């Protein structure tokens, strides 16, 4: 790998490369910047995704180039990345699980910029548990301002909090 380095993150050693590769050309944001961002948000992000299988959307040459989705754990992944297996209708996939900042650092190393997780987690026994979150995907349609969508989100929050549920806003940026 070009510009190989070993870094220590979250108590783990990780091989990284091409940290100066620009992943967001419009802003000049590099792989190292994405890695720093993932580390900055780890304390908030990890509890939300812990023990959830993660499908990754990767942009190895930057967001202005071809992307692809990846379910199975990459062959090059460090052995310390926790995994879980899901039997789908036509295939068996071994997914990585995010358990800390080191896994997030590895995800940034492979340019996994979008992280997709289901509404459920694996239990300590390795079996899928019941869903533990609800996602309301609010997208403004034609002629609808983002401000209107935000107002609907506030109404949803009020209703859900009245039901005793904890609300966590998430934006995708798309």
Model-derived features with residue positions:
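A short linear hydrophobic-aromatic micro-motif
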Residues: 164-169
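Hydrophobic/aromatic-lined pockets within catalytic cores
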Residues: 24, 46, 50, 161
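SsDNA-processing nucleotidyl-transfer enzymes
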Residues: 2-13, 35, 40-142, 146, ...
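Generic non-transmembrane alpha-helical segments
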Residues: 155-163
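Short, structural beta-strand-to-alpha-helix junction motif
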Residues: 30-33
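Short, conserved phosphate-binding/catalytic loop or strand-edge motifs used
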Residues: 171-174
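Acidic, metal-coordinating catalytic segment for phosphate/diphosphate chemistry
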Residues: 15-27
């Amino acid at each position: 790998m070009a510009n190989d380095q070993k870094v220590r993150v979250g108590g783990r050693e990780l091989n990284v490369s091409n940290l100066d590769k620009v992943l967001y050309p419009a802003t000049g944001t590099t792989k190292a910047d994405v890695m720093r961002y993932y580390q900055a948000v780890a304390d908030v992000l990890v509890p939300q995704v812990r023990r959830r299988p993660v499908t990754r959307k990767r942009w190895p040459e930057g967001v202005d180039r071809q992307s692809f989705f990846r379910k199975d754990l990459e062959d090059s992944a460090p052995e310390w990345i926790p995994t879980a297996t899901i039997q789908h209708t036509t295939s068996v996939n071994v997914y990585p699980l995010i358990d800390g900042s080191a896994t997030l650092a590895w995800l940034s190393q492979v340019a996994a910029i979008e992280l997709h997780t289901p509404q459920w987690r694996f239990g300590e026994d390795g079996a899928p548990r019941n869903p533990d979150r609800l996602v309301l995907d609010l997208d403004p349609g034609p002629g609808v301002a983002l401000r209107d969508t935000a107002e609907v989100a506030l109404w949803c929050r009020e209703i859900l909090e009245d039901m005793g549920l904890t609300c966590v806003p998430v934006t995708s940026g798309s």
